[in-house]
A protein has these predicted regions:
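Immediate post-signal peptide segment of exported/extracytoplasmic ligand-binding proteins
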Residues: 20-47, 131-142, 268-271
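Extracytoplasmic small-molecule ligand-binding "clamshell" domains
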Residues: 25-93, 101, 247, 260
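Short helix-initiation/N-cap motifs at beta->coil->alpha
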Residues: 53-54, 68-79, 130-131, 165-179
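Extended ligand-binding regions for polar small-molecule ligands
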Residues: 54-62, 121-132, 141-142, 149, ...
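A conserved helix-loop-strand patch within extracytoplasmic ligand-binding domains
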Residues: 65, 94, 101, 107-153
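Ligand-binding clefts/hinges and TM-proximal coupling segments of bilobed small-molecule sensing domains
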Residues: 66, 131, 146-159, 164, ...
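A ligand-binding cleft/hinge motif common to bilobed small-molecule-binding domains
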Residues: 76-79, 91-101, 156-157, 183-218
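Periplasmic-binding protein-like
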Residues: 111-115, 197-238, 260-271
Length: 271
């Protein structure tokens, strides 16, 4: 009789939910280009790495979720997020008012700037001593930029007489600059230094402008993109980012890839 009672109690516990399987770990899908050196790119062995990848792993590690990276072309990045192909954009995307009309962003994890690269000794005189552009010297100048970036907005707003040439990849910018198809290019200075100017192919080229950081165009910095309506996840991401800022992890990540750190003062006091 005791055995029957024990068996009945065991069945009751199992069927009433007393026995539960461990909860599956949360999984977050991260969209990035996978070709944007040194921020998110594949090594010769096919390993996805870069500053953005380290940031993504750092954030999601603090959150306690699993991460899956999804490669996506740049000009389709926001549409893919809105189509639920991934949960987050961690791909060096600048926070701008235009983009914030469609998606939400975390606090910045990197400053956002642009800089012109051209041939050494060309004496283009594109900028005045105070750092402002000289529109007259941009007239008819062939300026290469990557498609769907904020650099096109800067040129249109400041030197509209320039002849803009659009490219699908950053690598194509360097090639046409070398071949003389463009006079200058506008791009990210950190990436330009690492991938072009520090290489033999870029020895005859250099920066021909100061760093340009107009927040109205480039935004307040680079952030994590997320679909609107996911406020709880956004709060967790911001909390994780603040931890990475405070413990020096972001600076550590930058020094793995860049010849200089992204300055701490740019991160202090972000809310």
């Amino acid at each position: 009789m005791k055995k029957l009672i024990l068996l009945a109690m065991t069945i009751l516990v199992l069927t009433s939910g007393g026995f539960t399987q461990p909860a599956a770990a949360e999984s977050l899908r991260v969209g990035c280009e996978c070709t944007y050196f040194p921020f998110n790119y594949r090594t010769n062995d096919g390993v996805l790495t870069g500053y953005d990848i380290d940031v993504a792993k750092g954030i999601i590690g603090i959150i306690g979720a699993d991460v899956k990276f999804v490669c996506q072309k740049w000009d389709g990045m926001i549409p893919a997020l809105l189509a639920n192909k991934f949960d987050l954009i961690i791909a060096s995307m600048s926070i701008t008012e235009k983009r914030m009309q469609k998606i939400d962003f975390s606090i910045p994890y990197r400053i956002s700037v642009g800089q012109f690269v051209g041939k050494k000794g060309a004496n283009l005189d594109l900028f005045n001593k105070d750092g402002s552009p000289n529109p007259a010297n941009f007239k008819g100048l062939k300026v290469g930029i990557e498609r769907a970036t904020t650099y096109e907005n800067w040129i249109s707003a400041n030197v509209p007489s320039a002849n803009i040439l659009l490219y699908d990849t950053n690598e194509a910018l360097y090639l046409d600059l070398q071949n003389g198809r463009t006079d200058v290019i506008m791009t990210n200075p950190m990436k330009a230094f690492l991938k072009f100017l520090s290489k033999d192919k870029g020895k005859n080229f250099g920066f021909v402008s100061p760093p340009l950081d107009d927040p109205k165009i480039f935004g307040v910095g680079v952030g994590v993109g997320i679909a609107k309506g996911r406020e709880d996840l956004l709060k967790r991401i911001n909390s994780a980012l603040k931890s990475l800022i405070q413990d020096g992890s972001l600076e550590k990540y930058s020094l793995k890839y860049f010849p200089f750190a992204i300055h701490n003062e740019k991160w202090e006091g972000v809310e």
